[in-house]
Amino acid sequence: MASSLHKHLLSAARYHLKETKRMSMMVALNLAAEILAVDCGLKPCFLYDYTTSGVQQICSYLKELQNLGLIVGHLHILNIEETILIINVTKAVSYLETLLHSQDLHLIDVSNYLSQPELVSSNQVPQIHAQLAELLGHIKPYQSGQPASVSVGGIQSPEWNLCTMFGFFLQFPSTYWFDTQKGFENCLSFTPLRLFTVQANCSRIGHQSVQIYSFTVPECVYQATQVHLEDWSKSLKQAFNEQNYFTDLEIITNTVSLPSVAL
C-alpha cells in the first residue's frame, strides 16, 4: 500500500512540477510530507523551495494531492516577490493576529553594523505591526475557502523586511530582523548559533524523519529567549497531539558556527 502511494506521489510531482524529471522518491515524499504538515496544522506555512515551478504548476500539484485524498483542508498559495508560500490560512491568521496584539515579537537584530546579535528595540514594533496588519489584510479574505480547495494570490513589491515576514509566517519562535536601509548583510558570521531541528515520521504516507522546522537562535540571546522557546515547544507538542498525520516528534538541538549565514 505504501509503495503504491509512494509511486503515485513521485509521479504527481514529476508530472505537475517544472524540471522534476529527475526528482528522487525521497525528495517527492519530503515535499508531500511538508505540505501535509501545513494541512494538519503543525505549522501555518511552507516556503516552497524544491524546484523553480510557478504558481499554477504548484496549484495543479496540490489539487493532485487532494485527488489522492491526502489534503483535506483549504490551502492558499501566496507569491511574494517570486517566493512561493503554501499556507494554512486559518492557522496563519490566528498566529499573525496574536503577533499583532503583542508588544514582544521576539525579534533578533542581526544588522551588519552590530558586533553581535541583540534583541530588537521596542521602537521598531509599530513599523513591524503595520507590516503584519498589511499581510493579514491580504490573506484574511481567503479564510472562507472551502475544505479540500486551493486558492492563489500575490503581493507585488512590498516594502517589508521579507526575512522577518517569512519568519513570522513560518512561525519561528524567534525571528531575525535587520535594518534594510543600511544594507542586507548580517552579523551572524562565525557567531555561535543554537540550531533547532524538529522532525517526525509522517505515518500518513509512510515516510520517516521529516523535517518540520529548522531555525537558529544566537547563543548570545538564547537565555533572553529561553522561556519563549519553551512555550513555543509546548504549543508545538499540543498541536502535534491534535493531529494524526505524524508520529514520533523529536526536537533536536546543537550548536553551529558558520563563515556566512544567508537570510
Curated annotation (Swiss-Prot):
Domain of life where this protein originates: Eukaryota
Ranges annotated as spanning the membrane: none
One Pfam family matching this protein: DUF4504
UniProt xrefs under InterPro entries: DUF4504 (IPR027850)
Sequence similarity: Belongs to the UPF0739 family.
Name of protein: UPF0739 protein C1orf74 homolog
Native organism: Xenopus tropicalis (Western clawed frog)
Lineage, opening ranks: Eukaryota, Metazoa, Chordata, Craniata, Vertebrata
